[in-house]
Amino acid sequence: VVGGDECNINEHRFLVAIFNSNGFVCSGTLINQEWVLTAAHCDSTDFQIKLGAHSKKVLNEDEQIRNPKEKFICPNKKNDEVLDKDIMLIKLDSRVSNSEHIAPLSLPSSPPSVGSVCHIMGWGSITPIEVTFPDVPHCAYINLLDDAACQPGYPEVLPEYRTLCAGILEGGKDTCNYDSGGPLICNGQFQGIVSYGAHPCGQSLKPGIYTKVFDYNDWIQSIIAGNTAATCPP
């Protein structure tokens, strides 16, 4: 996250870190005791999930590590289009209990409204061009913009991709490299998943692109309920 500050250690209990043998890959969001939501483009062969983390150097006593037991990507996702249905649901290999730094964030009860203030967070780069990893997650507040605000900067993002456009039009605050998969929280509701953006991060007229969680509520709830053949909206 560029243009932000260190997150309050108690305000991201649902934020998880996804890492593999090469190191930190992505963030994700705990949505109940055994399921995490992230971006499909965060998938890799050997990743693990760390819950309850804040600082990379000073570990929280209640940090937990889980492996993915099952991973679900929309069966109707166009695989050659990385921005299409950029959402992945992960079942953990064992449940996690709520603790001081671990608690889920529920799915949105209504779609987000343009103009709402949204919270972004992650362990991604805090500088826009070269990648600078912070020791702690950084947080910032941005605005949910009309889809038309992202159209000029991102002609490749098609309307059927079910995305949200969020940022600051004049630039300066944005998610950045390695923030992928983390949450966009608007008016307290989990509305987006960090998917795509410009490089360098935080450019004017190039807000961030987020997967619209609300459109996938039915698919997510079906998978969790055991209907593993459920498909996503077109």
Swiss-Prot record:
Q: Give the Peptidase S1 domain ranges.
A: 1-225
**Which residues pair up as cystines?**
C7-C139, C26-C42, C74-C232, C118-C186, C150-C165, C176-C201
Task: Report if keyword Disulfide bond is assigned.
Answer: yes
> Which EC number applies?
3.4.21.-
Any idea which residues are catalytic in this one? H41, D86, S180
Where is the protein situated, by its record's location annotation?
Secreted
- Subunit description: Monomer.
Q: What is this protein called?
A: Thrombin-like enzyme contortrixobin
- What organism is listed for this UniProt entry? Agkistrodon contortrix contortrix (Southern copperhead)
**Which lineage do the record's taxonomy fields give for this organism?**
Eukaryota, Metazoa, Chordata, Craniata, Vertebrata
